[in-house]
Amino acid sequence: MTGSGGPTLTDGHGQEVAAAPCALPADGADWAEGADATDAAVARSADRQSRRWFAAASAGFVEIVGSCPRDRLTDPALGEWTLRDLIGHASRAYLTLEDYLEAGRPACAAGPSDGRQDSPRTPEPTAGRRPPRLGSPTAYLLAARSGLADPTAVRDRGRVAGEALGDNPGQAVARLAARAVALVARTSGDAEVLTPVGRMVLSDYLPTRAFELTVHGLDIARAVGRRPPAALRVALRPALHLCADLLSGDDRMTVLVALTGRAALPHRFSLV
């Protein structure tokens, strides 16, 4: 509707709301400045969202691990992993965050920052060639799936990390989480992260850690027969969004058909 005061919008109660005036940029430079401002706003929003997701996933993960009975740590949990192994594997989300941020600092030598034997190894840059730039969480997960997915190595790293958690994995995980959350809080979203498959910024890497904590938090809850904590349930929506971004080609159709009840997913279908 329009009136004497210019264009108006109608709100949900049928009341007219005056539209804000829109000034068109005068030239191409103004358009470019506007685009830069928009890009910066989008980046800030993405950074805030990734931090919120990581905080929720971490809180839920710590809670579910802390509730696990110690006498069940040797029970089967996921594939070849015991419950301890699974907790150890998932806790590496914190270790990789620390180590890859450390490796991304200027003039920083690659490798674990504190000598931990269970720390991931970050690669020495190839002479004369910088590691590739990864522009999104999806790009990292796809690259990691191709280059870091040796099942035996993944299994063994999980077991080593699980043993390193000691007699009280709940307390050990809580300490790792507190350290990582504090690190994230004092680090800019555009800080460089150097992973084995490429370089990226923290705001793009953080969702991959939140995804690990979310999915494996659910695995742990299932293994011990407990309802996932509320914080983990909050983390489900961004995890599903990231799963959707990982789909490509016919997989998009396959998943949509399954989600709308037309057919079941193929046997052992997985995005990761």
Where are these regions (language model features)?
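Hydrophobic-composition signal
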Residues: 35-36
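N-terminal interaction modules that seed assembly of large macromolecular complexes
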Residues: 80-90
